Swiss-Prot record:
It comes from the Bacteria. GO terms for biological process: division septum assembly; FtsZ-dependent cytokinesis. It comes from Shewanella baltica (strain OS223). It holds the Pfam family ZapD. This is Cell division protein ZapD. SUPFAM superfamilies: YacF-like (SSF160950). PANTHER family: CELL DIVISION PROTEIN ZAPD. Cell division factor that enhances FtsZ-ring assembly. Directly interacts with FtsZ and promotes bundling of FtsZ protofilaments, with a reduction in FtsZ GTPase activity.
Length: 244
């Protein structure tokens, strides 16, 4: 069996970042494979999230905070200076497009094809060709043309998604996995340092999955048997990383 990774954000900022990262991965998958009309679901979810919340200021503050921390690490002897330089350059480049005032994806609202689809996609079974003949026409286009269209649509969100990817990479890099045991299916941890993310890696052969709850200084992990859908009373070996 394979090892599965479960992540639990411990603050709203990381929760939002993970949702955006999840949609970004779906976008990239749709860019590489022809998933027909399913490619529009993550695109429209991203449109809705961007309209609901302007992440720009939060991301800019996070970039500045990490740049300051990375600059301090550069002065240390035992660190990978080349890797730090790569992150500093990447964050600096990612910061520039965020200075523009337009909301991410706002130009897609002017796209009549995209707007017509968004109005219908929330309705059950509303992708029939008599409801959306323009979609039926677009789906019949050669894959290369659809890929080009899709690439142009998701490009509107790259100024947001690129720094999100970098910031989550930096967050995950703050901790390594350590061996842990959930006795009777339960594990509790605490930290004097404010945590942002709990990561659990567990072998699927255990037949269970973790439910994680907590806040920045304390968290709890309950393992649930999938088949019975109840709390496991067995001791579960797993790997744990607590990221600040």
């Amino acid at each position: 069996m394979t090892e599965l990774v479960y992540e639990q954000p411990l603050n709203e900022k990381i929760r939002s970042y993970l949702r955006l990262e999840y949609l970004d991965k779906q976008l990239q998958s749709n860019l590489n494979h022809d998933h027909q009309h399913r490619c529009f679901y993550p695109l429209f979810s991203l449109c809705e999230l961007s309209e609901r919340c302007d992440y720009r200021n939060e991301v800019l503050k996070d970039i500045e905070r990490h740049l300051l921390q990375l600059s301090k690490w550069q002065e240390l002897d035992h660190v990978d200076h080349q890797q730090i330089d790569l992150y500093i350059n990447a964050l600096t480049q990612a910061r520039e497009p965020l200075q523009k005032p337009d909301r991410f994806g706002s130009q897609l609202k002017q796209d009549r094809f995209i707007s017509a689809l968004r109005q219908r996609f929330g309705m059950p079974g509303a992708c029939c060709n008599f409801d959306l003949p323009q979609l039926h026409y677009w789906l019949a286009k050669p894959w290369e043309e659809k890929q080009q269209d899709y690439r142009s649509w998701i490009a509107h969100f790259e100024p947001l998604l690129t720094p999100i990817t970098l910031l989550l990479q930096l967050t995950r890099s703050t901790a390594h996995y350590d061996n842990a045991v959930a006795h009777a299916g339960f594990y509790q941890g605490d930290s004097a340092q404010a945590l942002a993310l709990v990561r659990v890696k567990v072998d699927a052969s255990h037949g269970c999955y973790p439910t994680i709850s907590g806040h920045k200084n304390r968290f709890a992990i309950h393992f649930v048997q999938f088949e019975q859908q109840r709390h496991s009373d067995r001791s579960i070996d797993f790997l744990l990383a607590t990221c600040a």
